């Protein structure tokens, strides 16, 4: 089953933040804390992407933090106030996960993912091409076993590719040796 954020991989314009969104979803079952941190990172990258393409927003400096970006420069007025307020949950969960010893529950991490998904949906609706409405589905979050199976399959594919390339190189070298001996 395709993950919630998988559609981002098909949209090159979202390359800046798509990987972070996918990572946040992929790691949830293994580590809700790391998922919350990754959700916060994905949010920050997505917000910076908006600043880079929306001419209504003034360019940002390299030292602008996420809270400054969320609160300044007319950013809150771009979207529904309810969505904007919900973004604080992602920031709070991510910051607490990094800076405190507070245990983050799976439910809180899922909520962060859900809010991130809603925000990315809003971004796609406002700034994307070929928008298709999507709904967050918790059942699409890969479990640890599924994630391990994906990693194992990717590993097998890499081994196949290496072997194929090695065989190709050996064949090319054999032909070169034959040519030199002839």
Where would I find each of the regions flagged by the language model?
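Amphipathic alpha-helical interface elements
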Residues: 1-182
């Amino acid at each position: 089953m395709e993950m919630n954020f998988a559609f981002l991989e098909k949209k090159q314009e979202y390359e800046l933040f798509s990987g972070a969104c996918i990572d946040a979803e992929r790691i949830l079952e293994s580590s809700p804390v790391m998922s919350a941190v990754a959700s916060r990172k994905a949010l920050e990258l997505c917000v910076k992407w908006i600043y880079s393409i929306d001419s209504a927003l003034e360019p940002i400096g390299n030292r602008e933090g996420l809270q400054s970006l969320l609160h300044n420069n007319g950013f809150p007025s771009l979207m529904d106030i309810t969505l904007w307020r919900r973004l604080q949950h992602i920031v709070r969960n991510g910051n607490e996960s990094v800076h405190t010893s507070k245990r983050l529950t799976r439910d809180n991490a899922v909520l962060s993912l859900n809010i991130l998904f809603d925000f990315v949906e809003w971004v796609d609706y406002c700034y994307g091409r070929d928008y298709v409405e999507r709904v967050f589905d918790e059942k699409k979050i890969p479990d640890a076993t599924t994630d391990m199976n994906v990693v194992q399959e990717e590993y097998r594919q890499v081994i196949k590719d290496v072997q194929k390339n090695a065989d190709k190189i050996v064949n090319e070298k054999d032909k070169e040796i034959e040519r030199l001996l002839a």
